[in-house]
Structure formats: structure tokens, C-alpha cells
Amino acid sequence: MKVKELREMTDVELRKKLADTKDELFRLRFQSATGQLDNPMKIQEVRRRIARVKTVLRERELGIKHA
């Protein structure tokens, strides 16, 4: 999901997305530990998705506007 799409979401939607993505990361790490993960790059993708959501939430806290 792109940052532009995230910025169009409400705070409630972003927090839900963050919780869902963290849960997905937990499941991927568990699969990795048990040797069942097919694509290890999925962990990196999910971590970046979490970072994007957190960045948008923090921007809103600080009142940063984007054109």
C-alpha cells in the first residue's frame, strides 16, 4: 500500500491497519522460526508497511501537511 493511500485513511483505519500488520508480522516470524516460510522477503515488506503506517500517524500528531 502506498503512502498516498494511507494518508487518505482515517486514524481509526490506520490503527486497525497497524494492528493487523503487526499480527501478520508475528505470524510470519513464527513461520520463519519453524522453517515454514516460503518467501523471507515478506518479513521485510511487512516491516516497511508498519513503518509507513507509523510515519503517517506521527505526521498527523505533529500536524505535518503534504501537498
Curated annotation (Swiss-Prot):
Swiss-Prot/TrEMBL GO biological process terms: translation
Keyword terms of this UniProt record: Ribonucleoprotein, Ribosomal protein
GO molecular function, one term: structural constituent of ribosome
GO cellular component annotations of the record: cytosolic large ribosomal subunit
Highest taxon of the lineage: Bacteria
Cited Gene3D superfamilies: 1.10.287.310
HAMAP family named among the record's database cross-references: Ribosomal_uL29
Protein family membership: Belongs to the universal ribosomal protein uL29 family.
Name listed for the protein in its UniProt record: Large ribosomal subunit protein uL29
Organism encoding this protein: Desulforudis audaxviator (strain MP104C)
